[in-house]
Amino acid sequence: MATERRAVIKGAAWSLPVIAAAVAAPAAVASDGGTAECVPVRMHLDWAGDYRRTSATAGSAAVGDAESTIALTVTQASIGANTRTGNQARTENLNLAVSSFAVGGTASRGLAIHQSPISNSRKAASTSSAARIAENSQTIRFDFSEPVDQLSFLITDIDAAAYDYFDRVVIESAAPFTASSGSGSMVAGSGTTTDPLRAGRIEPVPETSGRANATVTFLEPVTSFSLTYQNVESRSNSRIDGDQAIFLSALSFTTTC
């Protein structure tokens, strides 16, 4: 999160969902009167075109056509006792909004998760108890209307700034996944509860840069997953608004039969 983060995100205006790919019907009638084989289709959910933010804690998206649509609901599942959505000054609340810029070195705008501590005296460190870290976190849940396969996306802007924030991200799902940083990224960890994705060092990175990205790929069909965003920078400065934000890139996945 670089200094330009504030005032650069806007809520996505609602429009009819963009058809990212035509979806094959699970069972179509073949020319000989039999049942045609279902063919999975690769789809792309673009936040700027397919998503509607209904509040700072909820939104929804849909891709597909009139015959078959994949819907996604995004909801805040929980928030810690020392965490609020938006910034500390309460002048901006950009949680679950779509960025006004392309994120993480991609060509697409991203979905923001934006939060801040309520009290600086209750901030957590990486060595704090699990309970204290939970107070300084927010969990967002993603639910698809039906299982999708080969789901993949980036989490961008996982960075840190002294006396401000230190990003950590935990992913949980019944489906197995991998989460890792690529060449040139400073992100460490694998996204699990014991090894969260996290800033590899204290360095604020511009939101448009790919140097703080992690790639998440699900290895089996998935219906839902959750993402817990934590702050483990215990220090603070009264002159610094301690808000933090990460972004999700567009989602790519394949329909299932």
Where are these regions (language model features)?
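A short beta-strand element within beta-rich, extracytoplasmic domains
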Residues: 148-162
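C-terminal region of N-terminal signal peptides and the immediate post-cleavage residues
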Residues: 20-42
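Terminal, low-complexity interaction segments
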Residues: 177-257
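Short coil-to-beta strand junction motifs in C2/discoidin
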Residues: 89, 162-172, 241-246
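Short beta-strands within extracellular/lumenal beta-sheet-rich domains
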Residues: 129-145, 160-169, 209-216
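Extended extracellular/luminal ectodomain segments enriched in beta-structured repeat modules
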Residues: 144-152, 221-224
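N-terminal secretory signal peptides and thylakoid transit peptides that target proteins
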Residues: 1-16
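N-terminal targeting leaders for non-cytosolic proteins
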Residues: 36-133, 172-194
